[in-house]
Amino acid sequence: MERRHITLPLTKELARSLHAGDQVYLTGTIYTSRDAGHKRMCEALARGEQLPFDPTDATIYYVGPTPAKPGAVIGSAGPTTSGRMDAYAPTMMSVGARGMIGKGARLPEVVEAMKKYDGVYFGAIGGAGALLAKCIKKAELIAYEDLGAEALRKLYVEDMPLVVIIDCEGNNLYEQGREAYLKEHNKKEGK
């Protein structure tokens, strides 16, 4: 496990250099979307339409930020549960999106797509939306304004603190942690 400062876009080479458990400080452009936005984007792709942003090597943050206070770039911007996007994540990766930021476990189908398309799943700290918002230096609404907090935004972040939860080889920090706990627990119990 390493501590790394990385700059986007998340190229295939950069994605392959990351490992489950790595602590990263992310700088660059990311896009926001939640389930309603993902559904619209996947429907647009099914109709042969272009997405509101170029998905090539893109990183998508699963967030619905609160409104910005006067003088602030954005309001609280904590991660939402990633499982809500599991139905759409393989499609998004198939068109070039590579990074996903959220919280919680992912379905096996998403992990398989990550292995196929060199995707990386980053975990952000739930409950720390105000802290994460401080890393967001620019925010621009780019599509689906009618979705309110779930509208698509283009953000520029600096040193956003994340952890690689699942790397592009399918290594999963959640599973590794569970296995390490059980191994230690069984050792203590004499099993």
For the regions a protein language model found, what residue spans apply to each?
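Short, structured beta-strand/loop micro-motifs enriched in basic residues and often containing a Trp
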Residues: M1-L10
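A broadly conserved detector of short glycine/acidic/proline-rich loop/turn motifs that flank catalytic sites
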Residues: L10, I30, P65-P67, D159, ...
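C-terminal binding/interaction regions
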Residues: L26, K134-K191
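Feature captures the catalytic cores and cofactor-binding loops of soluble hydro-lyases/lyases
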Residues: T32-S33, G37-M160
